[in-house]
């Protein structure tokens, strides 16, 4: 894997996950994007999708960022489709500012563990 150095702040993805310094279960990997099971999941299904090149956040993509974001979103879509197929629903989120614990663009693709009935009761529809 090719890694572009991160800024001086702590970046779990650049410093540990992408170079393979911590064990991760890879879900999808391309030349530019890595998707893996979260190392400290907050949901029963919790996958993180990151660009391998350091990118601070969704609002700070840098030069060439739009092309890289398109590649990341293609993997996010692939993972979300897998989660939806296996579990009936998927949630996709990203954070910026103080909500962003690691200063590296990343998306969470999750299934929170609700049953189909709980999802329908919460959202009042079925798009299946």
Predicted regions and their residues:
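HIT superfamily nucleotide-processing domains
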Residues: 1-128
């Amino acid at each position: 894997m090719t890694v572009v150095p991160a800024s001086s702040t702590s970046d779990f993805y650049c410093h540990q996950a992408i170079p393979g310094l911590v064990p991760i279960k890879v879900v999808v990997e391309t030349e530019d994007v890595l998707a893996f099971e979260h190392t400290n999941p907050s949901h029963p299904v919790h996958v993180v999708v990151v660009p391998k090149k350091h990118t601070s956040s969704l609002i700070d993509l840098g030069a060439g960022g739009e092309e890289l974001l398109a590649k990341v979103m293609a993997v996010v879509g692939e993972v979300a489709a897998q989660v939806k197929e296996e579990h009936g629903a998927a949630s996709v989120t990203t954070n910026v500012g103080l909500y962003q614990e690691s200063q590296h663009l990343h998306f969470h693709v999750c299934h929170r563990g609700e049953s189909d009935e709980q999802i329908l009761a919460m959202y009042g529809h079925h798009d299946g």
